[in-house]
Amino acid sequence: MVSIGQMRSLVESTCSKMGDKYASKDAVELVLATGIVESRYEYIRQMGDGPARSFWQVEPASAVDNCQHYLKYRSSLMKNCARASLVDTKYWQMYEEEIW
């Protein structure tokens, strides 16, 4: 398992790059707790043949839906997501599940 202290530091750093609204103590705790529930910070692929990825077990269809129907209309937030994830914004505008 990954050190919870290190995960907290990573989550706090990432949330702060998203903007003040996302860097609150409650927001950080929600993200941290979600990872604990979903994978215990042990797995980055869904067990079995499931499609979910990451410690937070995000399914590609959910990632695409969030990008296409939420972030698409919040360009500033999309840019913050790209910056926080160290991924070019153009990838946040690609809506094919295979990419995610």
Predicted regions and their residues:
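Peptidoglycan-targeting cell-wall enzymes and recognition modules
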Residues: 1-10, 36-100
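An amphipathic alpha-helix signature
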Residues: 8-15, 28
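Helix-loop segments that flank and shape redox-cofactor active sites
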Residues: 15-25
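Short alpha-helical scaffold segments that flank and stabilize functional sites
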Residues: 18, 30, 37-38
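Alpha-helical scaffolds flanking conserved acidic
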Residues: 24-33
